[in-house]
Swiss-Prot record:
Protein name, UniProt field: Kappa-theraphotoxin-Pg2a
Function: Gating modifier of Kv2.1/KCNB1 channels.
Annotated disulfide bonds: C2-C16, C9-C21, C15-C28
Entry domain remark: The presence of a 'disulfide through disulfide knot' structurally defines this protein as a knottin.
Stored SUPFAM superfamilies: omega toxin-like
GO molecular-function term, one example from the UniProt record: toxin activity
UniProt-annotated location(s): Secreted
Domain of life the protein comes from: Eukaryota
Pfam families linked: Toxin_12 (PF07740)
Similarity comment: family membership: Belongs to the neurotoxin 10 (Hwtx-1) family. 28 (Jztx-11) subfamily.
Main location: secreted
Originating species: Chilobrachys guangxiensis
Length: 33
């Protein structure tokens, strides 16, 4: 199950489509796509 916006993550693949993991803050955010 993918993480939604601002969900916790460790890598980009933890996040839903169009989201990427922010490594310093450890949450999913819009990746610009």
């Amino acid at each position: 199950e993918c993480r939604k916006m601002f969900g916790g993550c460790s890598v980009d693949s933890d996040c839903c489509a169009h989201l990427g993991c922010k490594p310093t803050l450890k949450y999913c955010a819009w990746d610009g796509t």
